[in-house]
Amino acid sequence: MSYHLSHILKVAILLFLVPLKISAQSSEVPLADPYVLLYDDIYYAYGTHSNDGIEVYTSDDLVHWKNAGLALHRRNTSQTRWFWAPEVYHIHGKFYMHYSANERLYVAQSDSPLGPFVQLGGPLLQNLLGDTYCIDSTVFVDSDGTVWMFFVRNDDGNCIWQVQLSDDFLTPVPGTLRKCIAVSAPWENIWPRVNEGPSILLHQGTYYLTYSANSYESQDYAVGYATSPNVLGPWEKSSQNPILRRTEGLLGTGHHTFFIDRKGELRIAFHAHSSASAIHPRAMYIGTMEFTHEGHLQLTSQPIVRPKLIAKP
């Protein structure tokens, strides 16, 4: 298998199906929009959960996790609410957290993956877009070293856009902003109009732009992908979509990120509802991905990992 994954710097709606009932488990890792970083042989998980900032969890095996507290506390930011969808990258000896707060994009820096992270500057796209709604950023380094940020902007619903970043991984390059994808497929038309939570893979010369569609509140929140021979698109959505939806009794499966585990396998971290009758809490789950001979991206037959939270002594 040959692929390239850049990690230098990534109300319930019941329609036609009666889902399996899932009991909320206090031992789950309560992260939505999860992101997993492997650093020095330890897994670090970040996500949406706390009103006070961004939590971090650690694990040796992807199954058992410890809550290591707040990696980013709101006192170290200019914002006070809606800390969502963090991704952490190790760059030149520092750790950079891309995240959204109050529906704007920010970057914070730390000397440790555990934090404390401190906000750098103001909203990342303010000079380019002004004070406008932007969430769900992910950073991708192309094979030629060019840095791209994919993110979500509201334009007739949540749509995915991209912009080039300078070598500092922080400064948007003027003239490079472009729209990538928007709601277009029948399976994506369950209220509201959403394409969000982007992530990028490069496999054998093809770029895979993965995303989530439908409301996160819906049991039909799901993951799909689009491909292009060029990082600038145009993007063609796969006929195999959605590739992650209501799997193994899990509902509302979405807002994923990818990472390479210790064995070199391509893994996907995503969230799902813990209950068939409530949106919250959402919890983190981990699957294994593969590319078929035809170039399709799909889940393998390996069971979904259901991370467990180790109680504090």
Predicted stretch roles:
Residues 22-313:
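Carbohydrate-active catalytic/glycan-binding domains of CAZyme proteins
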Residues 4-14, 21:
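Sec-dependent signal peptide recognition
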